[in-house]
Amino acid sequence: MSRSAALLLCLLGCHVWKAVTKTLREPGAGAQEVTLKVHISDASTHQPVADALIEIFTNQASIASGTSGTDGVAFIKFQYKLGSQLIVTASKHAYVPNSAPWKPIRLPVFSSLSLGLLPERSATLMVYEDVVQIVSGFQGARPQPRVHFQRRALRLPENTSYSDLTAFLTAASSPSEVDSFPYLRGLDGNGTGNSTRHDLTPVTAVSVHLLSSNGTPVLVDGPIYVTVPLATQSSLRHNAYVTAWRFDQKLGTWLKSGLGLVHQEGSQLTWTYIAPQLGYWVAAMSPPIPGPVVTQDITTYHTVFLLAILGGMAFILLVLLCLLLYYCRRKCMKPRQHHRKLQLPAGLESSKRDQSTSMSHINLLFSRRASEFPGPLSVTSHGRPEAPGTKELMSGVHLEMMSPGGEGDLHTPMLKLSYSTSQEFSSREELLSCKEEDKSQISFDNLTPSGTLRKDYHKSVEVFPLKARKSMEREGYESSGNDDYRGSYNTVLSQPLFEKQDREGPASTGSKLTIQEHLYPAPSSPEKEQLLDRRPTECMMSRSVDHLERPTSFPQPGQLICCSSVDQVNDSVYRKVLPALVIPAHYMKLPGDHSYVSQPLVVPADQQLEIERLQAELSNPHAGIFPHPSSQIQPQPLSSQAISQQHLQDAGTREWSPQNASMSESLSIPASLNDAALAQMNSEVQLLTEKALMELGGGKPLPHPRAWFVSLDGRSNAHVRHSYIDLQRAGRNGSNDASLDSGVDMNEPKSARKGRGDALSLQQNYPPVQEHQQKEPRAPDSTAYTQLVYLDDVEQSGSECGTTVCTPEDSALRCLLEGSSRRSGGQLPSLQEETTRRTADAPSEPAVSPHQRRSAHEEEEDDDDDDQGEDKKSPWQKREERPLMAFNIK
């Protein structure tokens, strides 16, 4: 059993093996042997071509080959499977190869195929030093096919020269000639091993060869430029790309090589291709790309796109330009709009002006627009006639802030105040009118007789010899000539009044007391002080910077100290006289057309030439107001201004104490600056200010300042920062606000009352003055006038009297308030008649001793020693310690 089973398995294996081997031996199962007759002839002469090579290709592989005989016929046998496509190719030397497909539907019994070979045309070979050119031998009007390449790319065989070379260039000029080229079936290899066959649509074809003498091809390396003209009926256009194909004789098919460009040469289109080698080339299009690959020039193909981009950019630039023009127009129109705002009616002007950095002028006291007062102001007092000179005295007063050198401070906001809308000072008539029912109120001219005391004051503030300063030496007041200049100025201002005192007899005690009583009334009642205390203290800090307001008046009368520099005031004394208003002397200004400018002055002989020179430069209209010569002025009783100056000089020789540190009521300032006091103060120094500031400023008008600051709580000037106040709103609602950091405390009635209470200690030194004050009724606070006190140059380090020491930069302009400290006489001519009537019986005032005059001059000389310490200050310190307040009448 085992043997029989093994035998069966062997037989089964043998049968399986035979079946497998039989299957493997018959791959072309169904293929039959077929004989094909091929006839080869000349395409141009139709003559048979002998010895032509015939090959049959299937799938790029040769399956059969043969040679034609003398009659050009060849019989080729091969195995053919039905459905396969064969390529029959015939080639011979000096002929363009040709091929044709063969694919029968059924297996034929007999089959014949004819192929015509196109003879290659000889070409003109031209070898240059750098280029080798091959041109078609047929020259004509139309462009000819041409090929050129670099000479160095030619590889000549051994024992071969250029004379042994033969060039052939054949181009298909018609569709029939294109058919003489091999069958146009292209093979597109994608580099992955997968190839696709395409039937090509030819455009043109060319064959180029370079042969040696024995007929072997000569190799050419490098780019070969092939140019072939196209048919006139071609549908191609300029800048079109057409695929180039190369014929491979080993594969019997066309291989894709690259792209050729179509150019326009006159009226003829040409196809140019850069070939890697010589051979058979055809320009044809494949079915995947049935049309030419057209690539137009960027200037024509992208014209619309480029125009759209340029149009968009132009539109954007136009919009930006319009925005820029609009912005510039608004910038240019802003100053005009601001100028138009300043021309608004009087009712809206003050509320429309800028409160922070505007350079416009807003009157400080009682100013009105010309529209409200079209004519000259007439000041009447209950039926009294208008006095001459009142119109000049009622000019608007302005606050200005200037640097010590005379230049405007451009970095500080400007503060402007107008009391034209305040309830307390609603009109000039209410301030200047004397109410008949209030008999205790007297005018400013009641202090002295009308015709004489005013001349005394004019003599004390008349022109003094100012030393000319160049603009670059504005801060160089510490020169050696400064001492003589300052001393001569003090002598000129103080000598007339002191000589007047020497000539005058003893004055009546009661008269002087009456003057001081009327001019500086006693403190108001406790009920009024309590009413002032009711003002909320938090109002000063409750508002933002843009809504701060200037109060309409100070809580209580304070001290008005006129000095050359705020920082020279002793801190201890400065706090004892709170609240105090310190005004630098060299910031007082007056208009050039004031009536008291050119009043003659009696001066020493050594100063007469300087004074006459300055007076000659004044305008002629000012010279005719006071034609009286100085020799006609008669001695008159000394004013209370001189008495106040004498108080200060006597106080400078004594040590200050809490009992005598406080100023008397004659040195106090009422609730706020009034027009009479300011007009009197400014009228005295107009001549000095106008000439001195023009000389010190180099003849150029000083720029307007931007802010003013007043410190009444004892702070030094360096601690007062810059800010601004909404001043206009203060006049309407009576707010008690002040600048956040100006140092002004408007709710300090206790210190003010203490200052008035302590003032009695100073007045005890002059009992005749106090007795006379008690005889006359007291004037209300609203009409009390300000006594300007000038703290002359007393050395600060040697005493604690609170006097100031002028800095070198301030000494040249300290004279601008000197006259204010010498006088408090009447500035309203309309009120001087009453003064004459009330003081006609008053005896002469006691003369001032020569010792007092020498003491004032010695104190000024001692002041120069302290000026040297100011040189060590940096420009920043000088800027931060500059004076706080300036008055200017415009």
Curated annotation (Swiss-Prot):
Location within or outside the cell: Cell membrane
Of the GO CC terms on this record, one is: plasma membrane
Biased composition, class Acidic residues, residue ranges = 858-869
The record gives the membrane topology as: Single-pass type I membrane protein
Outline which residue ranges sit on the Cytoplasmic face. Answer: 325-890
Q: Which family does it belong to?
A: Belongs to the FAM171 family.
The organism encoding this protein is: Pongo abelii
This chain belongs to the protein called Protein FAM171A1
